[in-house]
């Protein structure tokens, strides 16, 4: 099975312009993401998918590969679809979508999501990661998307609210969604043609589109958190964690 990992990265960000190139311990953030991903076993290739020449130059500068995507891409999925079309991937090839703002991603988590497709061939077209929340402040923070899943680890729902809600107790595990996806090329093409979902639009969570249209999303629970960098303040947190990693 060919497995291509794509790291979508865009320069424009209302909260943090130029985020992929923000220096973390002397290297641009996108380099940390690329290098940590490259440690995962089972990958055929890794590319950064971007429409910005500054990001392209930075990635090629440290020896990484780039696929240039259209500046008209309306969503992350559109950028992924553009990239896989250019790369000429086969329908049953696996694509891992790792966000460019996760410099702390653990390669074992990437291996976990790949192994789901190896152990359950043909049972689903899309998979993602979850992590049990350990920080109290994350429970009710809408920035941290929560998820619930059934006994077979199929996602039931994703929400910015705390789910599930314990009516009589707060003593139960709550899981947050880690922004890593894997899917077959065929599923990406199917997903991109689906109309915007009502719940997707309410929560502003693209993955809900798959659930709303009856598609399974398999979940692997990671033992490693992968916090995203959303603001310049998050850089300092990453630097501290990388120093002891």
UniProtKB/Swiss-Prot annotation:
Entry's EC annotation: 2.7.7.90
Major localization listed first in the record, in broad terms: cytoplasm
Gene Ontology molecular function: any one: 3-deoxy-manno-octulosonate cytidylyltransferase activity
Keyword Nucleotidyltransferase on entry: yes
Catalytic activity: 8-amino-3,8-dideoxy-alpha-D-manno-octulosonate + CTP = CMP-8-amino-3,8-dideoxy-alpha-D-manno-oct-2-ulosonate + diphosphate
Protein location: Cytoplasm
InterPro entries on file: Cytidylyl_trans, KdsB, Nucleotide-diphossugar_trans
Transferase as UniProt keyword: yes
GO cellular component: cytosol
Signal peptide: none
Pathway membership: Bacterial outer membrane biogenesis; lipopolysaccharide biosynthesis
Annotated function: Activates KDO8N (a required 8-carbon sugar) for incorporation into bacterial lipopolysaccharide in the Shewanella genus.
PANTHER family, A to Z: 3-DEOXY-MANNO-OCTULOSONATE CYTIDYLYLTRANSFERASE (PTHR42866), 3-DEOXY-MANNO-OCTULOSONATE CYTIDYLYLTRANSFERASE, MITOCHONDRIAL (PTHR42866:SF2)
HAMAP family: KdsB
Protein name in the entry: 8-amino-3,8-dideoxy-manno-octulosonate cytidylyltransferase
Species annotation: Shewanella piezotolerans (strain WP3 / JCM 13877)
């Amino acid at each position: 099975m060919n497995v291509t990992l794509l790291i979508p990265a865009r320069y424009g960000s209302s909260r943090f312009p130029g985020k992929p190139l923000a220096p973390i311990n002397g290297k641009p953030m996108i380099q940390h993401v690329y290098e940590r991903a490259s440690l995962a076993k089972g990958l055929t290739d890794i590319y950064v998918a971007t429409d910005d020449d500054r990001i392209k130059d930075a990635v090629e500068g440290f020896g990484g590969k780039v696929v240039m995507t259209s500046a008209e891409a309306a969503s992350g999925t559109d950028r992924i679809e553009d990239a896989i079309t250019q790369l000429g991937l086969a329908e049953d090839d696996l694509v891992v979508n790792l966000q460019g703002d996760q410099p702390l991603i653990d390669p074992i988590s990437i291996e976990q999501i790949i192994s789901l497709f190896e152990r359950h061939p043909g049972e689903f077209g899309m998979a993602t990661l979850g992590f049990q929340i350990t920080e109290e402040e994350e429970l009710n923070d809408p920035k941290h998307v929560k998820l619930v899943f059934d006994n077979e680890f199929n996602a039931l729902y994703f929400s910015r609210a705390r789910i599930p809600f314990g009516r009589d107790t707060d003593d139960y595990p709550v899981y947050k969604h880690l922004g890593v996806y894997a899917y077959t090329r065929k599923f990406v093409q199917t997903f991109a043609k689906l109309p915007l979902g009502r719940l997707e639009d309410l929560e502003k969570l693209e993955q809900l589109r798959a659930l709303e249209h009856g598609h399974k999303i398999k979940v692997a629970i990671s033992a490693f958190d992968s916090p995203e960098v959303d603001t310049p303040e998050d850089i300092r947190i990453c630097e501290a964690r990388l120093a002891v990693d």
